[in-house]
């Protein structure tokens, strides 16, 4: 998930009540899972098995539950529960918005696409051209098809 605009890592640290070590003047551009991270992203790790992989990933900011050496240019955000901190950040930038109808007005449906009755299309969904969404299918918020 990309943030609407770059966010100071200090602000994120305050949000999740983290101790920051390393590059505390930088800006994060998004938050992602370990297998999807890019430069500028935040990622979390809460198991020793994945510490090295996470610290050496493309992510510039690592939410972690232990102090360790910080690679050049990166920052560690040290908290007791990294997953809880990760969820708090995601919920801040993408809070739950209840659906008020089956096909949300904020969604974009491509030319030639057909949505069958009883299909659910969530908030800010993008469906490309010439797609068929069958009955009883649910496409949740922010999905791109």
PLM regions and their residue ranges:
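Structural signal for interior beta-strand "rungs" in well-ordered beta-sheet cores
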Residues: 44, 102-145
């Amino acid at each position: 998930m990309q943030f609407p605009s770059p966010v100071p890592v200090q602000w994120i640290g305050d949000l999740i009540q983290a101790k920051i070590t390393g590059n505390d003047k930088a800006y994060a551009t998004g938050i992602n899972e370990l297998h999807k991270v890019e430069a500028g992203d935040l990622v979390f790790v809460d198991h020793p098995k994945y510490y090295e992989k996470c610290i050496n990933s493309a992510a510039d900011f690592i939410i972690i539950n232990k102090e360790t050496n910080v690679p050049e240019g990166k920052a560690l955000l040290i908290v007791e529960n990294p997953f809880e901190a990760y969820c708090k950040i995601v919920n801040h930038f993408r809070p739950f918005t209840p659906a008020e109808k089956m096909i949300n007005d904020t969604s974009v449906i491509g030319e030639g696409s057909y949505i069958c009755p009883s299909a659910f299309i969530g908030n800010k969904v993008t469906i490309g051209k010439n797609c068929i969404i069958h009955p009883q299918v649910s496409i949740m918020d922010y999905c791109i098809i």
